[in-house]
Amino acid sequence: NKMLDIKFVRENPEVVKQNIRNKFQDNKLELVDKVLELDKENREIKQEVEALRAERNKISKQIGALMGQGKKEEAEEVKKQVAASGTRIEELSAREKEVEEEIKKIMMVIPNIIDPSVPIGKDDSENVEAERFGEPVVPDFEIPYHTDIMESFDGIDLDAAREVAGNGFYYLMGDIARLHSAILSYARDFMIDRGFTYCVPPFMIHGNVVNGVMSFAEMESMMYKIEGEDLYLIGTSEHSMIGKFIDSIIPEEKLPLTLTSYSPCFRKEKGAHGIEERGVYRIHQFEKQEMVVVCKPEDSMMWYDKLWKNTVDLFRSMDIPVRTLECCSGDLADLKVKSVDVEAWSPRQKKYFEVGSCSNLGDAQARRLKIRVNGEDGKKYLAHTLNNTVVAPPRMLIAFLENNLNADGTVSIPEVLRMYMGGKEKLVPKH
């Protein structure tokens, strides 16, 4: 259960250490030396056990012969030797278990090797803009705060939600609720048209799946646990979609698996940001259309580019300008090889904000969950996994409403969404 192969660490300790430095996690450097010592001990134990077993088998064969020759005392001597090496083997095996447990623990926190193209930086403030799509226009009229736009359509009730569930929840109503669902339905069909298989997965998963798809640090800040049960609410359908392939061997000719899943998502949002602002920007519950790919290692970078481009195309089809942002080394979660955020333009704030994230996890999740491929030559190898947001309202409704708002307070419905909105071409405010 780890991100890297111990063999890789053994053969490339400096690469592993430099990668840790690049991620500004220097407190983990000593773990590399520690795990290599444990690995050495583990291999020595294995050799010793093997030698003892061979020796024991050899001498136990003498017992019968000695008894047959009436050499009883000598036979007893040999029996004692056999018993002693049996005890020693047991001691060694117990230690071996301990050592392997410790190795596993350390390997769980040694980060995956990032792609050489990833910019080096401490945190998300050092992410690098890659490309812009669509003109980030600021209109010549005042754009209200997103909840005020929603309220003009009687579309949101945050006060009632706070009474019922606390901060970070919302009631969406009327046209705004319908818009929320329409965008998800459109996103689903958009991905089906691009050849992805639609899937509705479990919205809760066991702890072993949680450990397989994310680092412990991520789990602590995101996941809600169901009291008294081995169940967690998913933070994204990626969790249950990757979990679907736990302990499996996929025939190579079945690859790539290209899936698009829908689910509600639940997040504690513990940590740096918390939930401070009024509205639907940072919330405990949202809905998401997701894409997940399981593919051959040599194809994962090609799929990575295809995935984020899908999101860009989708947002552009709804008249929302976007940009891509390369995540720097310090901002990358420990399992990720490379990641890009898709950000939508907010004409009200005159800046871009995150609406999706595309990641290549290399074989990190596959290693933890044992997702293997049966190659043409009969050799088994680990698959690569990727995930990307198609769309995750209600946060992206902020960008949708701001970019499609007109001076008279109406909101234009882009053509692609009209069939999901009962043919409406625009939303007209109630007050």
Give residue spans per PLM region.
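Short, Lys/Arg-enriched, disordered terminal segments
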Residues: 1-3, 430-431
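N-terminal alpha-helical targeting/anchoring segments
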Residues: 2-136, 151, 155
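TRNA-recognition modules of translation machinery and tRNA-sensing kinases, especially anticodon-binding
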Residues: 29, 132-431
